[in-house]
């Protein structure tokens, strides 16, 4: 994370667990919102926000178990970014979000077919922004789909932007900043904004679970 701004985890889910999450995509009662990306100029594809992550135990367990390590990293970055620290448990963060009017859960599942892609963006959703998020690959690249690489772009003040392509395997997660990361310069730390997106899928189907820890307004 400190060197590149993106880190790939060991496998977090088995193929069976990945399929269990993919299967939820066809259960409309589990979701609060469906976004057809081309209608909003977001790219092409579909994603859905879970109405209550607790209704999908595997998703809720991932959020709760991954959050403490994410909070530890976020709190290491906080003084470097000149930002606040965050509580040690997900429940405390969700309570803070609710007090600020951010009550809509943000975990989502994204589904891309041939030709689908995501434009570069950031997932902010409100005033309270937990600075790290995780995207978990639910299919095997090269076997279930081709193309569809994850693209990250880092804006560097007074320099050209830097692009990175990341290729996680089935069940692996990518940890990356929601907005920016700290970089040590001559006069201390400065913020480098980062955005993320997805290259066009060439064949097959690509599914991803997105875990954003703050809720939305």
Predicted regions and their residues:
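A short glycine-rich, His/Asp/Glu-containing loop-to-beta-strand
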Residues: 102-114
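Short, conserved beta-strand element in jelly-roll/cupin
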Residues: 111-114, 126-144
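A structural signal for short, well-ordered beta-strand segments
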Residues: 107-109, 134-136, 209-213
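Proline-centered turn/helix-capping motifs that create local helix->coil transitions or kinks
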Residues: 78-83, 140-146
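Catalytic core of Fe(II)/2-oxoglutarate
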Residues: 130, 141, 145-217
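Generic detector of contiguous secondary-structure segments
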Residues: 52-64, 95, 114-117, 130-131, ...
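Histidine-centered catalytic micro-motifs
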Residues: 118-125
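Non-heme Fe(II)/2-oxoglutarate
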Residues: 1-93
């Amino acid at each position: 994370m400190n060197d590149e701004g993106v880190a790939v985890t060991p496998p977090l889910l088995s193929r069976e667990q990945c399929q269990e999450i993919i299967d939820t995509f066809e259960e409309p009662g589990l979701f609060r919102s469906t976004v057809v990306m081309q209608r909003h100029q977001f790219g092409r594809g579909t994603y859905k926000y879970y109405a209550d992550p607790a209704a999908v135990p595997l998703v809720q367990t991932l959020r709760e178990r991954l959050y403490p390590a994410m909070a530890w990293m976020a709190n290491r970055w906080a003084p470097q970014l000149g930002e606040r620290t965050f509580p040690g448990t997900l429940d405390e963060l969700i309570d803070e979000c609710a007090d600020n009017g951010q009550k809509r859960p943000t975990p989502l599942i994204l589904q891309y077919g041939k030709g689908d892609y995501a434009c570069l963006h950031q997932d902010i959703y409100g005033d309270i922004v937990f600075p790290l998020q995780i995207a978990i690959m639910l299919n095997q690249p090269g076997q279930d789909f081709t193309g569809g690489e994850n693209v990250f772009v880092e804006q560097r003040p007074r320099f050209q932007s830097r692009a990175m392509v990341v290729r996680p395997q089935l069940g692996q997660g990518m940890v990356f900043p929601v907005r920016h990361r700290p970089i040590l310069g001559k006069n201390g730390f400065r913020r480098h904004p980062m955005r993320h997106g997805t290259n066009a899928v060439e064949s097959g189907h690509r599914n991803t679970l997105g875990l954003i820890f703050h809720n939305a307004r």
